[in-house]
Swiss-Prot record:
GO biological process assignments: proteolysis
Name of the molecule in the record: UPF0758 protein COPRO5265_1522
Molecular function GO labels: metal ion binding; metallopeptidase activity
Organism: Coprothermobacter proteolyticus (strain ATCC 35245 / DSM 5265 / OCM 4 / BT)
Transmembrane segments: none
Domain MPN: 109-235
Domain of life of the native organism: Bacteria
Motif JAMM motif per UniProt: ranges: 184-197
Record-linked Pfam families: RadC, UPF0758_N
Length: 235
């Protein structure tokens, strides 16, 4: 007697329909989200294929952003997700995040608030605008105002984060940075600077001047919006 819930394993699908073979023949950019995630999951179970499980995960958490923010414990509550699959998913998403963090603009120079906003929009918007907690970053620049690297300094709550000036000065020293830009997000989606944002920025600017580094700007990332404290003349 056949099992009505039995799903044909992906390895028995027509070759042209298998996620991995599709990626190899057409390229990853042509695969829908569920097929990409199915490649990470590798296997399903007797009741659903890896692609079915992938689609259910994406629907449950609202896409890759929600999946990234989900904890391992939350993933394990999903039927069909064991520790190995949860680890595979979290590792793959973390790799994507780190790629965005480490990518830099070749020969880019940041000399105006508009340059700073453009950089933040390109490298931080997708990463920070849907975060549920405040993340505080610094972008370190060389003597020609070209990006050296960006570093996450702290992660706080949904309404604030604590910044240690010593950690920022340490990064300035390690990279011999001549200038820097502060970047953090407002989980509420409203990038309007608070009094605390302005006060902390001024304190950090004074601290940086003590070691010969210039704090050029502080960019606040909101929901598809950015505010430059330098452009608003708040520094």
């Amino acid at each position: 007697m056949s099992n009505p819930n039995y799903k044909i394993p992906i390895k028995e699908w027509i070759v042209s329909e298998r996620p991995r073979e599709l990626l190899l023949s057409k390229g990853p950019e042509h695969l829908p989200d569920a097929k990409l995630l199915a490649i990470i999951l590798r296997t399903g179970n007797k009741e659903e294929t890896a692609e079915d499980l992938a689609r259910r995960l994406l629907n449950t958490f609202g896409g890759f952003t929600g999946l990234y923010r989900a904890s391992v414990e939350e993933l394990l509550q999903i039927k069909g997700m064991g520790k190995a699959k949860a680890a595979q998913v979290k590792a793959a998403l973390e790799i994507g995040k780190r790629f965005l963090q480490n990518e830099t603009v070749e020969e880019a120079r940041i000399t105006t608030p508009e340059d700073a906003i453009e950089y933040a929009a390109r490298y931080f918007s997708s990463m920070l605008m849907n975060e549920g907690k405040e993340h505080f970053w610094i972008l370190l620049l060389d003597r020609k105002n070209r990006p050296i690297k960006h570093v996450e300094i702290s992660v706080g709550s949904s309404i604030q984060t604590t910044v240690d000036p010593k950690e920022i000065l340490k990064q300035v020293s390690l990279t011999s940075a001549q200038a820097l830009i502060l970047i953090h997000n407002h989980p509420s989606g409203d990038p309007s600077p608070s009094r605390e944002d302005v006060a902390v920025t001024k304190q950090l600017k004074q601290a940086c001047e003590l070691v010969g580094a210039q704090l050029l700007d502080h960019i606040i990332v909101g929901k598809n919006q950015h505010v430059s404290l330098a452009r608003e003349k708040l520094i």
